[in-house]
From Swiss-Prot:
Residues 1-91 form the 2Fe-2S ferredoxin-type domain. GcoB has an unusual three-domain structure, with an N-terminal 2Fe-2S domain and a C-terminal region that consists of an FAD-binding domain followed by an NADH-binding domain. PANTHER family: NADH OXIDOREDUCTASE HCR, PROTEIN RFBI. It holds the Pfam family FAD_binding_6. It catalyses: 2 oxidized [cytochrome P450] + NADH = 2 reduced [cytochrome P450] + NAD(+) + H(+). The keyword Oxidoreductase applies. FAD binds at residues 145-148, 162-164, 170-172, 215, 330, 334. Part of a two-component P450 system that efficiently O-demethylates diverse aromatic substrates such as guaiacol and a wide variety of lignin-derived monomers. Is likely involved in lignin degradation, allowing Amycolatopsis sp. ATCC 39116 to catabolize plant biomass. GcoB transfers electrons from NADH to the cytochrome P450 subunit GcoA. Highly prefers NADH over NADPH as the electron donor. PROSITE patterns: 2FE2S_FER_1 (PS00197), 2FE2S_FER_2 (PS51085), FAD_FR (PS51384). This is Aromatic O-demethylase, reductase subunit.
């Protein structure tokens, strides 16, 4: 049965089986979201009227007390009646609608140790913001896996994904690293996620630091390129934390960006396998060494939870404003 759901004065229809988050995003109504698995709590909202089924919302993300008080996770909750909710102050603004996509694989290339670049071609342009992600449907399993977009929004008919092999992973070992080839069809949904730049009229052109761990580099590439397109002379530091030199990729691309934009600097940092050509240690520590004060800077973090948390501490240590800190944790698939 279809129910009407509303937030911030905007109303959409929620079709059978859809979560509140999916209904709002498909209707072009923005709702804070990140993991889409119920683990991060970004999409937590207040149910003002109506009733919802909380689905698979984990207890550690949405406690029994919170459920009793009317809180819900938009990515897990499904309405059981017409429902009105309250979210953040910006919820309800128009955004890029969530879409079902059928893409054609244009290229599959090994670019680093256990890392592949996958290029997907679309018949119709996809409106998105650099830094958002798409969900791929794993053939034959019904499983869905999330991959950040590495390209910019003007490249709207090609989706660039950076994929790291997960031993035993249903998506990587069973598909993306074993059998996926140019010409294959891929089913996906997108765009999703809040990890992107503010609108151009809210972007002050100030200095930025972006820290990515492993393939957490992917969304940062699109964000950095978009930021430089808006303000070509801005200072942008992009740190890539990996285990060893064999895990680095796209060094030529970053050299070209640096040549075009003198304020851009790419800093690889190796944690486990020392190499005299690169810095050792952790990218979050490298930032602390390089930037005496983070006042006026904005910070972007993407990668494993431990790295992201270390980055938040590093930014705060350098007195970066909390409202300028943006993060995207790579969490295990549920």
């Amino acid at each position: 049965m279809t129910f009407a759901v509303s937030v911030g004065g905007r109303r959409v229809d929620c079709e059978p089986g859809q979560t509140l988050l999916e209904a709002f995003l498909r209707g072009g109504v923005w709702m804070p979201n990140s993991c889409n698995q119920g683990t991060c709590g970004t999409c937590k909202l207040q149910v003002l009227s109506g009733e919802v089924d909380h689905g698979g919302a984990p207890e550690d993300t949405l406690s029994a007390e919170e459920r009793a008080s009317g809180l819900a996770l938009a990515c897990q909750a499904r309405p059981l009646a017409d429902t009105e909710v309250r979210s953040t102050a910006d919820a309800g603004r128009v955004t890029h609608p969530l879409r079902d996509l059928t893409a054609t694989v244009l290229e599959v290339a090994d670019i680093a140790r256990d890392t592949r670049r996958v290029l997907l071609g679309l018949a119709e342009p996809l409106a998105f913001e650099a830094g958002q992600y798409v969900e791929l449907v794993v053939p034959g399993s019904g499983a869905r896996r999330q991959y950040s977009l590495a390209n910019t929004a003007d490249e709207d008919k090609v989706l660039e994904l950076h994929v790291r092999r997960v031993p035993g992973g249903v998506a990587t070992d069973g598909w993306l690293f074993d059998g996926l080839a140019a010409g294959d069809r891929v089913e996906a949904t997108g765009p999703l996620g809040d990890f992107h730049l503010p609108p151009p009229d809210e972007d002050d052109g100030g200095p930025m630091v972006l820290i990515g761990g492993g393939t957490g580099l992917a969304p940062l590439v699109g964000i950095a390129r978009t930021a430089l397109a808006r303000h070509p002379s801005r200072e942008v530091l992009l740190y890539h934390g990996v285990r060893g030199a064999a895990d680095l990729y796209d060094l030529g691309r970053f050299a070209e960006i640096a040549e075009e934009h003198p304020g851009f600097r790419f800093v690889p940092v190796l944690s486990d396998e020392p190499d005299p050509a690169y810095r050792g240690g952790f990218p979050t520590d490298a930032f602390v060494e390089d930037v005496p004060s983070g006042r006026g800077w904005s910070g972007w973090l993407c990668g494993p939870p431990a790295m992201v948390e270390a980055g938040v501490k590093a930014f705060k240590r350098r007195r970066m404003s909390p409202r300028r800190i943006h993060r995207e944790k790579f969490t295990p698939a549920s």
